[in-house]
């Protein structure tokens, strides 16, 4: 099962057709296929459930998709060495310097020769669509990776009106107040890790394994620094880092949560996958609701 390690959350601003038949048809147009001998990369949808044919996994109003990106890896020094050899050989043979366009043509030929022997780097990115709350969660640590996946989904569906989930109260201000005033929300526990920044972004302090109620940390907050990253524990169910842009990083579900479905036999892979997906989405939905409550709700967009 794809236990999310990060969560970049987006708000769907319009309702879309998520029916299984329509979704499968749309995703099939951009299904992932392995790179051919002349392909540098491939990007498309793969099956979330091992051995299944569907390019989506659905339980109730929850949908799981998996974007698969394959890239051929050709070390630049290998290309340079082979290219230099070819350039030297041709320049000596013709007793002249090659033009820029000729060198580029040689480079393209070198790459095409090396491609069939190149290793592949594979990357899978899970997407969870909550059609009940109209939120999309992407397991990505960078906005670039998330935007690439959203672009693939938009291409597949024809339209995808989304915006990043924004809180009414700035997370940096709220996190700072939680620590400075010792007023943590009831369901959250601050862990001993944070990042502090000055308003001008010139000074950054990163602390780890250090009590956040120490005089040193509180002094920085009194002098105007804000907490931009804060490690938190949510009701002993999972830990994560809340960022000032509202994204959740380094999600780690507690063992007692991940083991809840251990009574299901390992041989029954599909049933365990189903149960774990329901469990994970339920936990993250509840966490999102709690964060919205304590960060003033969702920001109103004009």
From Swiss-Prot:
Q: Which InterPro entries match?
A: RdgC
Q: Please tell me whether the keyword Isomerase is annotated for this protein.
A: no
**One Pfam annotation, family name?**
RdgC
GO biological process, any: DNA recombination
Does the keyword Cytoplasm belong to this entry?
yes
Keyword vocabulary terms for this entry: Cytoplasm, DNA recombination
Q: Where in the cell is it found?
A: Cytoplasm, Nucleoid
Instruction: Report the GO molecular function annotations.
Output: double-stranded DNA binding
A GO cellular component annotated for this chain's UniProt record is: cytoplasm
Role of this protein? May be involved in recombination.
Q: Tell me which family the UniProt entry assigns to this protein.
A: Belongs to the RdgC family.
State the HAMAP family in the record: RdgC
Protein's UniProt name = Recombination-associated protein RdgC
Q: Which gene encodes it?
A: rdgC
């Amino acid at each position: 099962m794809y236990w999310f390690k990060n969560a970049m959350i987006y708000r769907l601003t319009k309702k879309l057709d998520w029916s299984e038949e329509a979704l499968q048809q749309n995703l099939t147009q951009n299904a992932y296929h392995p790179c051919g001998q002349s392909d540098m990369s491939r990007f498309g949808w793969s099956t979330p459930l091992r051995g299944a044919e569907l390019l989506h996994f659905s339980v109730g109003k929850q949908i799981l998709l998996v974007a698969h990106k394959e890239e051929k890896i050709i070390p630049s020094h290998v290309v340079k060495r082979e290219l230099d050899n070819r350039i030297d050989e041709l320049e000596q043979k013709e007793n002249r310097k090659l033009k820029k366009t000729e060198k580029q043509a040689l480079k393209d030929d070198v790459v095409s020769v090396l491609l069939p022997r190149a290793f592949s780097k594979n990357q899978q990115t899970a997407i969870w669509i909550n059609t009940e709350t109209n939120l999309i969660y992407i397991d990505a640590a960078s906005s670039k990776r998330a935007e690439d996946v959203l672009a693939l989904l938009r291409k597949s569906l024809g339209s995808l009106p989304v915006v990043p989930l924004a809180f009414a109260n700035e997370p940096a201000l709220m996190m700072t107040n939680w620590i400075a005033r010792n007023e943590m929300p009831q369901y959250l526990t601050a862990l001993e890790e944070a990042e502090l920044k000055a308003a001008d972004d010139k000074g950054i302090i990163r602390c780890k394994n250090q009590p956040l109620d120490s005089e040193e940390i509180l002094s920085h907050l009194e002098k105007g620094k804000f907490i931009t990253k804060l490690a938190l524990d949510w009701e002993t169910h999972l830990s994560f880092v809340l960022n000032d842009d509202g994204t959740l990083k380094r999600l780690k579900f507690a063992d007692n949560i991940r083991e809840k479905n251990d009574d299901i036999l390992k041989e029954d892979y599909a049933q365990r996958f189903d149960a774990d997906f329901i469990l994970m989405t339920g936990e993250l939905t509840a966490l999102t609701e709690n964060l919205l409550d304590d960060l003033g709700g969702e920001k109103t967009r004009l």
